C-alpha cells in the first residue's frame, strides 16, 4: 500500500509543478509583450508661467486592461522635490486613487486635478495662483501594483512685484502718473492678484500704492503701529478701496520678464548719472530700469554696491544679507537723498552703474502691456505660442459651446487674452479627434489669422474658406509664461451660418499672395478678448475683431512669395485689390418702427470690403525686417486718427470702383463706464488713376447702427475693421480732419505754414457734395522709403512735406434709420449755428488762415454717436480737449425724415431715444478749461453722412474739421438734461482771429473776452473759464463762488491715530496722542511689546484663557497694565474685534454701588450699556462689567466670579523710577518702569511729619508729577533738643549767635527732585 501511495503523491506533485510552470511562462510572455503602465514623458523643458497665473503641470500615462481578478486602481502622487535654488525638498502636494483626491494642508485651495474625474489616465496638476516660491522641480508618480512610473516637471515662475516711490516725495503719484512710472520702469502697474501673490510669499511694505483697478493697497505680514489699515492686527493686504485717480500715493509695479541681462559696472572712479549713461552706451547697453534690476535680483543678482539706474535713482540688489548691505532681509536696496526715505541722489553725486543689454534688441513687439483703467487690463500671451514637441489635439466634444458660462479664472478678476499671429512657427496644428486631450499643454490658446477669399471666388458665388495661418518672420526667442491654456480656456471654432463665407481651421502654411498680377491678400490677426468678472460672464467668442496688418499691392492673378510685407503707418499702397469677409457678431434689431424682440438674436454677419484700381503701385513695399519697431499686434488700442489711403498727390482722373463693407470702432477705455460696439455700414469709393480709396456710405436716407457685441467693461480696448479696409489705424504721425468738398473740378491751391502748395480734389462726376478728409500734418519716420515711393511720377509735393493735404471724397448718404422702442422725440439743441451761404471757402488748417482760389463749397455732414449721450464730434490739435454737450434721452421711436429747405448737421442716438434727422447743431471749437475732468465714455462710434440739399460752407461757423476717430483727445460732458438747452460755445482768442473776409453769420457765437483775465478767485483759487462763465477751484479750507469762505479744516478729520484737530486761520493744528508725532500725527514714535497691539497711543492684548475678574486684573497689573478701559466708540470697536466671546473689561462698582470706575483710574467718558443695564440683578452681586459678544460688545454687569477671557491695556510710554524725596520713601517695591497713569505713594521716615499730598502720577508724556510731599520733624522735639544743647554747652559758648541770627543763616536741605527740575511738568 505504501508504494502506490508514493506514486500517486509523486504524480500529483508533478502535475502541480507543470501547472505552476505554465502559469509563470504565460505571465512572462505577457510582460514581455506589453507593460500594464506606461507614462508619456513630454520632455518639453521647463514650464514657465507668470506670477499669480494658473499653470498646468502635465502628467499623462496609459493603462493596459488587467484581468478582473487582479484589477487595481493606479495611485497618483504629486511631490515637490526641489526648490528654485536647487535645494532638495520632499514636500507632498496631493495623492489620488480611485477618483478620491487628498490635498496636503499647505496646498489646499491652490491645486487640483481637473481632468482626473473624467479621464483617470490624465493626472495633469493645475496649480495657481502662482507664487514665486512655487518655482522648482515637481514629480508625478504613478503606482499600480508593483509597477511604478514617474516624471519630473520643472516649473519656473517669472515676474516680480516691487514698490516704486516718486523722486519728488512719498505719496506723490496720481493714478495716471503711477501707470507711467511703471511703464518707464519696464513694468506695468500691478494687479491685486499680483500683490496678493507677493504677500503670500512674504512681501511686506508699509507704503500705500496704486494698483491697476484704481484701488490703493499695501501688504503687511507683521502688524506694527501705523500699518494696521483695515485689518487691525491681522496680517494681510490692507486696502483703502477705490480712490479718486487724482489722489496721491506710491505705486506697486509688476515686471514680468527681463529679456536681456543686467550687469554691474564698477570703474575705478565712480560715475555721475551722465557718466553712468555714457559708460553703459560704450558697452552696447543702457542704464537698467528699476523693473529690470528687480528681475535681475529675482534671477539671482547679488551686488552690494549702489549704482545708477535709468530713472535717476540709486539702488543695489542683495540676495544674501550681510553687514553694511542694507538690512537683514534680501531685496533691492534704495539710496535716498533725505533721512525720511524720500528723494533721489543728486545727478552730480558719484556711484557705480547697473546696465542692461537686451538679448534681441530688434524684437520689441513682445508682450503687450496695456495700462488698466478699472479692473485689470493686463494682456497675457501677446506673443505667439511656444514650440511644442507634441502635436496637441482638440477634441470635438470639448469645444466650448455658446451657453457655457462657467468662469474659467479662479481669481474672479477680469483678464483679457490677446491672441495674435505667431511669427515664424513651423508647427502644424493637426487635430486628431481620437487622441487623448493634449491641447491643454503647453497652452490652450488658439492663434488665429484669417485670410480672405479672392474676388474671383466671391464673383463665382462659391463659399471661400478662411483658415488659420501663421505668418513667417524672424525667429523669436521662446518667451516665458506661455502655458495659460492649461487653465482650461478654449476658443470656439464656430461654423459659419449658411450663406456666410467665413470659418476657421488650423493650418501651418504661411499666408500666400496671388502674384502674377501682384495681388496679395494681407494676413489678418484675430484678436480674441475674454472677459471674466464678477456678476458678468463673457463668452470668449463674443468679441472677434479683424484688422488689416499688412496691406498688399498689385492686381489679380498668379502666385507670389510668402514673405510678408508691411507698410509704414503713413504709407498705404495706392492700389488695393482683394475681397475679404470676416465674421462679426451682431445684435439683430427689429425692422419695424416700434417692434422690439423679447430676446435679441445673435447671428454672424460678414464684413466685406473690396477696393480695386487698374494702375499698379508707384512704390516698393519693404519687408518687416527693415523696420523692427513696427507694431505687430493685431489689436487697436482704441479709436485712432485715420490716415489717407494714397501716398501720392491726388490725381484728377476718375476711375471709380465702389466697395462696400462695415467698419466699427470703440472709444478708449474709461473707468466706471460701459462701452458698446456698433457697426457702421461703410463703402469705399476709390477715384483717380492711383486708386484713391474714398470712404462713402450707402445711398439711403438714414444711418443704420447695429450693436455688434455685449456691453463690456470700458477698460477693454477693442477695434473692428474691415479686413481690406483702406483706412487702417495708424499712430499719431498722421492727423486727419474732414472739410467740405468743393464743387470745382480743379484743385484748390492752399498755402500752409511752410508755403508749399497742395491739391484739393473733387470730381465733377459727383453731383452730391460731401465731406473731405485732410491730412493736417504728416511726420516722416522713414524718409528713405518716401523717396522710393514717390519718385518722378509725383506731379506735386511729396507726401512727407508739411502742409500737404490729401483729400479722398466721402459721399454722404444714409441708410434708413430704424429705432427699437417707442418714446418721445427729443431735440438736443435749439440755439445752433446756422450754415448760411457764403462766397468764401477754404480749408481750416492749424496756424493758417490764408485761403486762396475761393470756390463754392458745400457741407452736409451728419455725426451720430450710438450712446445715450448724443454729441457731434470735432477734432482738435493735440493737447486740446473736446467738449460734448450732453443730452438725456427719454425713450426712442422710429424717426421719419423731415424735409428741410437747407442741409443741417444732425445728431442721432439709439440708446433710449431718437432725434429727428434734421436737427441743427453747431460745429466749432468749444472752450474747455484746462485740467477739467473729462468723461471718456462718450463717443463710442461715429458716422459721417449727409442729405441731398446742400448749402455753401461757411468757414466762420465751422472752424474745426470733423474726424471719424479721435486719439489722445478727451470728451467732456459740458451740460445737459431733459428739456435743458445744451451749450456749445465757440471762443476765438487773440491768437486765432476771425477769418479775414468772412463776416460772422446770423446765429454764430460771438467772441467773448476771457472772464479769468483778472483772476476773480480769492485765497489762491484757480479760475476755470467756460465761455463768458467761470468757476473757481478752491484750495483746501476755502469755499464759495470766489473762494471767499474760510471753512473748518477739521471737518474732514485730517489728524490720524486719534489726534485732535484744532482749526486755525488758513490751516489747522493736530494735537497728537502719546507716542505719535508729525503734523498729522502720522508718525509712530513708540511701539508695543511683542504680542501687544497698538491703537491710539495704547497697547492691548487679548487673553483667551478664562479667569475671574480679580484674577484677570491681577494678571494685567503683573504685565504693567490694567483691564482695558474704553473711552470712544473707535476704541470699543477695536477691542471688540479681538474675540468672539464675552470679555472682561476694567469697569466695576465694587467700592460704591452704581459708581462705576475704571481700574486704571481714568474717567468714565464713554458708555455702551445693553438695554436696561446695569441692573444689579443679583442684589449687590453684579459688580463687574463684561462685553457681550453677540450684541456687538455692549456692556452688562455680572458677578465677578465668572471665568471669562479678558483684554489688558497699558501705555506705550512708560515712566522711569519715581523721584527721590528727602526724608521719605516709597510704599511698596520700587520698579524700573511704570505704566502711564500709574500712581505711587511716599511715606515720611520715622520721626518726620508729612505735609501736602503724598502721591504722584505717571503722566502720558512719560514724566512724573512733581512731588508735593514735605517731611519735617515736629517743632516740640526740636525745641527740647535745642534747649538741652544750650544747657550742656553754656560754658563753652559764651559768644553764641542769637536765635534770630541762627534762623537767618540756616541751610535748607536740597531735595533730589529739584536737581531734575527739567524732567517734570
From Swiss-Prot:
What residue spans carry the region label Disordered?
Answer: 362-414, 455-479, 493-518, 531-579, 683-729, 745-766, 876-956, 1275-1321
The signal peptide stretch is 1-22
Residues with glycosylation annotation: 122, 340, 381, 411, 1026, 1223
Localization, per the record, is: Secreted
Q: Where is the composition biased (Polar residues)?
A: 363-373, 906-922
Q: Where is the composition biased (Basic and acidic residues)?
A: 1309-1321
The Ig-like V-type domain is annotated at: 38-153
Q: According to its UniProt record, how is this protein modified after translation?
A: O-glycosylated; contains chondroitin sulfate.
Q: Where is the EGF-like domain?
A: 1008-1044, 1046-1082
Q: Which domain of life is it from?
A: Eukaryota
Alphabetically sorted, this entry's keywords are: Calcium, Cell adhesion, Disulfide bond, EGF-like domain, Glycoprotein, Hyaluronic acid, Immunoglobulin domain, Lectin, Proteoglycan, Repeat, Secreted, Signal, Sushi
Domain Sushi, by residue range, is: 1213-1273
Q: Which GO terms describe its biological process?
A: cell adhesion; central nervous system development; skeletal system development
GO MF annotation list: calcium ion binding; carbohydrate binding; hyaluronic acid binding
Q: Which residues form the Link domain?
A: 160-255, 259-357
A GO term from the CC aspect: synapse
Q: Describe the task this protein carries out.
A: May modulate neuronal adhesion and neurite growth during development by binding to neural cell adhesion molecules (NG-CAM and N-CAM). Chondroitin sulfate proteoglycan; binds to hyaluronic acid.
Name of the protein this chain belongs to? Neurocan core protein
Amino acid at each position: 500500500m505504501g508504494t502506490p501511495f508514493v506514486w500517486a503523491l509523486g504524480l500529483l506533485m508533478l502535475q502541480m509543478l507543470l501547472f505552476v510552470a505554465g502559469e509563470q511562462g504565460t505571465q512572462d510572455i505577457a510582460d514581455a509583450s506589453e507593460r500594464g503602465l506606461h507614462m508619456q514623458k513630454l520632455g518639453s523643458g521647463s514650464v514657465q508661467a507668470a506670477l499669480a497665473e494658473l499653470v498646468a503641470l502635465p502628467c499623462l500615462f496609459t493603462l493596459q486592461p488587467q484581468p478582473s481578478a487582479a484589477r487595481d486602481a493606479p495611485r497618483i502622487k504629486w511631490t515637490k522635490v526641489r526648490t528654485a535654488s536647487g535645494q532638495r525638498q520632499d514636500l507632498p502636494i496631493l495623492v489620488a486613487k480611485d477618483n478620491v483626491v487628498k490635498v496636503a494642508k499647505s496646498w489646499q485651495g491652490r491645486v487640483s486635478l481637473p481632468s482626473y474625474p473624467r479621464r483617470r489616465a490624465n493626472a495633469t496638476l493645475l496649480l495657481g495662483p502662482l507664487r514665486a516660491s512655487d518655482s522648482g522641480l515637481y514629480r508625478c508618480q504613478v503606482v499600480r501594483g508593483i509597477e511604478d512610473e514617474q516624471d519630473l516637471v520643472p516649473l519656473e515662475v517669472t515676474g516680480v512685484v516691487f514698490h516704486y516711490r516718486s523722486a519728488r516725495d512719498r505719496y506723490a503719484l496720481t493714478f495716471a502718473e503711477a501707470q507711467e512710472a511703471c511703464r518707464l520702469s519696464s513694468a506695468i502697474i500691478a494687479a491685486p492678484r499680483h500683490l496678493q501673490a507677493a504677500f503670500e510669499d512674504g512681501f511686506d511694505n508699509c507704503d500705500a500704492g496704486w494698483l491697476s483697478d484704481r484701488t490703493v493697497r499695501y501688504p503687511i505680514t507683521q502688524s506694527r503701529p501705523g500699518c494696521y489699515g483695515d485689518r487691525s492686527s491681522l496680517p494681510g493686504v490692507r486696502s483703502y478701496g477705490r480712490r479718486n485717480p487724482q489722489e496721491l500715493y506710491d505705486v506697486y509695479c509688476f515686471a514680468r520678464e527681463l529679456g536681456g541681462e543686467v550687469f554691474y559696472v564698477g570703474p575705478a572712479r565712480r560715475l555721475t548719472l551722465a557718466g553712468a549713461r555714457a559708460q553703459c552706451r560704450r558697452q552696447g547697453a543702457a542704464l537698467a530700469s528699476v523693473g529690470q534690476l528687480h528681475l535681475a535680483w529675482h534671477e539671482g543678482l547679488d551686488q552690494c554696491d549702489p549704482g545708477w539706474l535709468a530713472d535717476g535713482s540709486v539702488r543695489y540688489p542683495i540676495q544674501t544679507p550681510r553687514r553694511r548691505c542694507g538690512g537683514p532681509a534680501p531685496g533691492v536696496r534704495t539710496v535716498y537723498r533725505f533721512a525720511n526715505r524720500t528723494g533721489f541722489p543728486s545727478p552730480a553725486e558719484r556711484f557705480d552703474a547697473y546696465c542692461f543689454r537686451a538679448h534681441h534688441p530688434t524684437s520689441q513687439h513682445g508682450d503687450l502691456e496695456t495700462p488698466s483703467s478699472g479692473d485689470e487690463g493686463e494682456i497675457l500671451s501677446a506673443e505667439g505660442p511656444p514650440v511644442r514637441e507634441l502635436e496637441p489635439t482638440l477634441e470635438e466634444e470639448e469645444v466650448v459651446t455658446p451657453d457655457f458660462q462657467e468662469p474659467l479664472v479662479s481669481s474672479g478678476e477680469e483678464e483679457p487674452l490677446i491672441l495674435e499671429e505667431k511669427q515664424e512657427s513651423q508647427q502644424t496644428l493637426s487635430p486628431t479627434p481620437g487622441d487623448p486631450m493634449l491641447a491643454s499643454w503647453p497652452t490652450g490658446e488658439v492663434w488665429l489669422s484669417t485670410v480672405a477669399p479672392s474676388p474671383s471666388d466671391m464673383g463665382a458665388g462659391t463659399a471661400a474658406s478662411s483658415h488659420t495661418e501663421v505668418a513667417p518672420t524672424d525667429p523669436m526667442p521662446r518667451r516665458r509664461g506661455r502655458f495659460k491654456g492649461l487653465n482650461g480656456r478654449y476658443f470656439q471654432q464656430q461654423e459659419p451660418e449658411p450663406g456666410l463665407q467665413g470659418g476657421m481651421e488650423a493650418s501651418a502654411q504661411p499666408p500666400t499672395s496671388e502674384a502674377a498680377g501682384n495681388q496679395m491678400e494681407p494676413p489678418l490677426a484675430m484678436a480674441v478678448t475674454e472677459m471674466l468678472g464678477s456678476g458678468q460672464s463673457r463668452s470668449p467668442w463674443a468679441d472677434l475683431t479683424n484688422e488689416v496688418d499688412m496691406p498688399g499691392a498689385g492686381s489679380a492673378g498668379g502666385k507670389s512669395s510668402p514673405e510678408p510685407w508691411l507698410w509704414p503707418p503713413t504709407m498705404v499702397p495706392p492700389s488695393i485689390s482683394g475681397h475679404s469677409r470676416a465674421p462679426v457678431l451682431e445684435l439683430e434689431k427689429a425692422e419695424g418702427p416700434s417692434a422690439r424682440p423679447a430676446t435679441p438674436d445673435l447671428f454672424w454677419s460678414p464684413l466685406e470690403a473690396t477696393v480695386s484700381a487698374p494702375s499698379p503701385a508707384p512704390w516698393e513695399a519693404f519687408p518687416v525686417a527693415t523696420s523692427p519697431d513696427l507694431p505687430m499686434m493685431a489689436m487697436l488700442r482704441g479709436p485712432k486718427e485715420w490716415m489717407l489711403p494714397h501716398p501720392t498727390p491726388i490725381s484728377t482722373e476718375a476711375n471709380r470702383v465702389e466697395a462696400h463693407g462695415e467698419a466699427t470702432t470703440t472709444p478708449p477705455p474709461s473707468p466706471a463706464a460701459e462701452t458698446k460696439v456698433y457697426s457702421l455700414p461703410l463703402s469705399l469709393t476709390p477715384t483717380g488713376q492711383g486708386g484713391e480709396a474714398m470712404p462713402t456710405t450707402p445711398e439711403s436716407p438714414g444711418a443704420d447702427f447695429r450693436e455688434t457685441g455685449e456691453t463690456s467693461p470700458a477698460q477693454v480696448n477693442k477695434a473692428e475693421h474691415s479686413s481690406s479696409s483702406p483706412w487702417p489705424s495708424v499712430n499719431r504721425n498722421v492727423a486727419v480732419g474732414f472739410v467740405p468738398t468743393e464743387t470745382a473740378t480743379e484743385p484748390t491751391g492752399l498755402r500752409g505754414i511752410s508755403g508749399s502748395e497742395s491739391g484739393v480734389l473733387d470730381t465733377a462726376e459727383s453731383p452730391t457734395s460731401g465731406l473731405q478728409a485732410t491730412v493736417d500734418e504728416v511726420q516722416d519716420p522713414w524718409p528713405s522709403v518716401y523717396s522710393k515711393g514717390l519718385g518722378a511720377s509725383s506731379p506735386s509735393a511729396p507726401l512727407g512735406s508739411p502742409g500737404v493735404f490729401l483729400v479722398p471724397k466721402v459721399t454722404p448718404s444714409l441708410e434708413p434709420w430704424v429705432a427699437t422702442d417707442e418714446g418721445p422725440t427729443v431735440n438736443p439743441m435749439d440755439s445752433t449755428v446756422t450754415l448760411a451761404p457764403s462766397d468764401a471757402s477754404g480749408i481750416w488748417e492749424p496756424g493758417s488762415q490764408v485761403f486762396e482760389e475761393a470756390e463754392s463749397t458745400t457741407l452736409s455732414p451728419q455725426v451720430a454717436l450710438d450712446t445715450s449721450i448724443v454729441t457731434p464730434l470735432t477734432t482738435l490739435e493735440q493737447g486740446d480737449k473736446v467738449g460734448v454737450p450732453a443730452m438725456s434721452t427719454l425713450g426712442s421711436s422710429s424717426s421719419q425724415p423731415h424735409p428741410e429747405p437747407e442741409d443741417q448737421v444732425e445728431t442721432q442716438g439709439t440708446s433710449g431715444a431718437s432725434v429727428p434727422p434734421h436737427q441743427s447743431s453747431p460745429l466749432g471749437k468749444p472752450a474747455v478749461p484746462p485740467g477739467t475732468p473729462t468723461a471718456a465714455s462718450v463717443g463710442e462710434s461715429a458716422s459721417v453722412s449727409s442729405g441731398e440739399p446742400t448749402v455753401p460752407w461757411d468757414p466762420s461757423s465751422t472752424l474745426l474739421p470733423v474726424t471719424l476717430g479721435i486719439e489722445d483727445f478727451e470728451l467732456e460732458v459740458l451740460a445737459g438734461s431733459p428739456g435743458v438747452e445744451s451749450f456749445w460755445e465757440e471762443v476765438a482768442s487773440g491768437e486765432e482771429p476771425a477769418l479775414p473776409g468772412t463776416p460772422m453769420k446770423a446765429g454764430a457765437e460771438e467772441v467773448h473776452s476771457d472772464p479769468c483775465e483778472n483772476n476773480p478767485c480769492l485765497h489762491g483759487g484757480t479760475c476755470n473759464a467756460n465761455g463768458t462763465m467761470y468757476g473757481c477751484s478752491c484750495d483746501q479750507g476755502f469755499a464759495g463762488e470766489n473762494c471767499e469762505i474760510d471753512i473748518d479744516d477739521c471737518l474732514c478729520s485730517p489728524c490720524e491715530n486719534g489726534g485732535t484737530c484744532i482749526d486755525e486761520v488758513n490751516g489747522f493744528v493736530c494735537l497728537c496722542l502719546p507716542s505719535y508725532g508729525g503734523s498729522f500725527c502720522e508718525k509712530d514714535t513708540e511701539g508695543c511689546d511683542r504680542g501687544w497691539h497698538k491703537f491710539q497711543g495704547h497697547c492691548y492684548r487679548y487673553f483667551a484663557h478664562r479667569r475671574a475678574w480679580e484674577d484677570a486684573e491681577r494678571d494685567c497689573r503683573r504685565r504693567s497694565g490694567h483691564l482695558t478701559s474704553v473711552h470712544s466708540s473707535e476704541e470699543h470697536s477695536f477691542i471688540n474685534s479681538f474675540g468672539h466671546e464675552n470679555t472682561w473689561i476694567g469697569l466695576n462698582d465694587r467700592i460704591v454701588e452704581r459708581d462705576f470706575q475704571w481700574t486704571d483710574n481714568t474717567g468714565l467718558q464713554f458708555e455702551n450699556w445693553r438695554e436696561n443695564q446695569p441692573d444689579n440683578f443679583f442684589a449687590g452681586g453684579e459688580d463687574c462689567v463684561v462685553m457681550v459678544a453677540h450684541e456687538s460688545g455692549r456692556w452688562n454687569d455680572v458677578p465677578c466670579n465668572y471665568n471669562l477671557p479678558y483684554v489688558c491695556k497699558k501705555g506705550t510710554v512708560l515712566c522711569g523710577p519715581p523721584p527721590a524725596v528727602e526724608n521719605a520713601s516709597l510704599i511698596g517695591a520700587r520698579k524700573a518702569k511704570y505704566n502711564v497713569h500709574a500712581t505711587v505713594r511716599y511715606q515720611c521716615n520715622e520721626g518726620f511729619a508729612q505735609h501736602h499730598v503724598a502721591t504722584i502720577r505717571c503722566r502720558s508724556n512719560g514724566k512724573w508729577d512733581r512731588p508735593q510731599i514735605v517731611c519735617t520733624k515736629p517743632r516740640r522735639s526740636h525745641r527740647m533738643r535745642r534747649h538741652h544743647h544750650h544747657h550742656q554747652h553754656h560754658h563753652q559758648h559764651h559768644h553764641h549767635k542769637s536765635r534770630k541770627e541762627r534762623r537767618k543763616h540756616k541751610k535748607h536741605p536740597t531735595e533730589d527732585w529739584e536737581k531734575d527740575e527739567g524732567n517734570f511738568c
